[in-house]
């Protein structure tokens, strides 16, 4: 894969607030955060980092080292993500050029014994199945996923819901897999504008239901191996309007095509770059002209080049792309909202506690490498988890984070 997208931020929202009694909160301040003592002068730690257990077995309670001074605790959760996938089911995904099957573009299909299938289709189908299986295995109440497959041997109207956006439990994962399974195979053209226009409406009209909360981020993922057979500019205009609309929709572009292909009739990297730029997900400093003639820098979109690769190799690339997108929209930013009963808050008396889905509490130290930091040391509005702490939060979707107010901040000195 040519690049790893970074830099798209999304927040989390305050879901529950609980006052926990009196302690060592800051008195007499004139603002939400009164400045206090710089965190570096507070309870410093020279332990390893997140999860080392050194006086960090968190939570507010009788056995908790924070219980004697904590004044309030605010539970936070990630901002939910509503993701709609648009998947290319056109004939070229099956190695068909409109007249003939292209030599070297098809392989024996493990899902359909005795049939040769386009290696791009085998790869994308199997990668998406792995993505769905992972979501099912680690249920994430902050992520809902739906899908629209355009063209194919079982075509559905772009103005209709295909696989509805929903929490990915066993039933949803099964529905997503079934939409890609034999006897469904690639067929026909690439009506990408029609697909984008119709499915933006589907995404924006999504109403979350339990366990998916409201207030989420709208994400469109467009995957194609060709150029539109309907309206190229319309695709770009639609994504740009969605990015500027209400609700805002950010769009990722995943291109599966060779750089030396004819950009007028087969595959155009510049078009894919424009989709990413219009959708608000092009990495800063990317090369919008990245392609066969100019491979300097990185492409603005997710570029997967099949070339002479096998379906298994293309699958690895595509799965990395879809997981990178998931990682990008998954937040490690937590808002610092004043809890009820907290009084004035000193930023040097704030701690972050992570509770795993198994119930283990860990007080995360303030540390820019593997702990957490403020967005502003004097007037913070949020904390951001880094390194090990962020990885732990993302790896345990059902874990919880609490902002504990009133106790001297546990600080870890980076060595």
Report the location of each language-model feature.
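MIDAS-like acidic motif and immediate structural context at the N-terminus
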Residues: 78-117, 224-225
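Short, charged loop segments at secondary-structure junctions
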Residues: 93, 106-116, 136-201, 227, ...
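Ser/Thr-rich, Pro/Gly/Ala-heavy low-complexity intrinsically disordered linkers and tails
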Residues: 17-67, 71-74
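C-terminal "exit" segments of structured domains
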Residues: 25, 69-77, 289-415
């Amino acid at each position: 894969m040519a690049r790893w997208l970074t830099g798209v931020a999304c927040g989390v929202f305050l879901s529950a607030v609980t006052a926990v009694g009196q302690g060592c909160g800051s008195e007499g301040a004139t603002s939400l955060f009164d400045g206090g003592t710089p965190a570096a002068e507070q309870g410093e730690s020279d332990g390893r980092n997140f999860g080392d257990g050194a006086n960090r077995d968190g939570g507010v309670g009788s056995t908790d080292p924070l219980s004697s001074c904590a004044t309030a605790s605010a539970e936070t959760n990630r901002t939910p993500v509503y993701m709609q996938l648009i998947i290319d089911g056109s004939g070229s995904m099956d190695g068909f050029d409109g007249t003939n099957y292209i030599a070297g573009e098809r392989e024996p299909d493990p899902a359909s014994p005795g049939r040769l299938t386009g290696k791009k289709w085998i790869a994308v189908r199997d990668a998406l199945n792995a993505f769905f299986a992972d979501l099912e295995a680690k249920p994430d109440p902050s992520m809902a996923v739906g899908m629209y497959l355009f063209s194919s041997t079982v075509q559905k109207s772009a103005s209709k819901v295909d696989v509805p956006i929903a929490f990915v439990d066993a039933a949803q994962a099964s529905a997503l897999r079934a939409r890609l399974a034999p006897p469904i195979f690639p067929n026909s053209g690439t009506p990408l504008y029609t697909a984008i226009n119709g499915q933006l409406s589907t995404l924006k009209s999504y109403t979350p239901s339990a366990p998916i909360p409201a207030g989420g981020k709208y994400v469109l993922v467009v995957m194609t191996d060709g150029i539109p057979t309907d309206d190229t500019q319309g695709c770009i205009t639609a994504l740009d309007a969605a990015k500027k609309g209400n609700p805002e929709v950010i769009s990722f572009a995943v291109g599966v095509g060779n750089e030396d292909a004819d950009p007028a009739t087969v595959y155009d990297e510049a078009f894919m770059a424009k989709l990413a730029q219009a959708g608000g997900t092009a990495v800063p400093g990317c090369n919008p002209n990245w392609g066969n003639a100019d491979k300097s820098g990185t492409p603005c979109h997710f570029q997967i080049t099949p070339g002479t690769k096998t379906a298994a190799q293309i699958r690895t690339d595509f799965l990395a792309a879809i997981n990178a997108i998931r990682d990008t929209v998954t937040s490690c930013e937590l808002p610092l909202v004043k809890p009820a009963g907290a009084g004035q808050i000193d930023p040097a008396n704030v701690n972050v506690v992570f509770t795993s889905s198994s119930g283990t509490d860990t007080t995360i130290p303030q540390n820019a490498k593997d702990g957490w930091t403020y967005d502003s040391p004097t007037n913070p509005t949020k904390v951001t988890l880094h390194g090990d702490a962020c990885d732990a939060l993302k790896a345990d979707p059902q874990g919880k984070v609490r902002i504990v107010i009133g106790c001297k901040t546990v600080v870890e000195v980076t060595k």
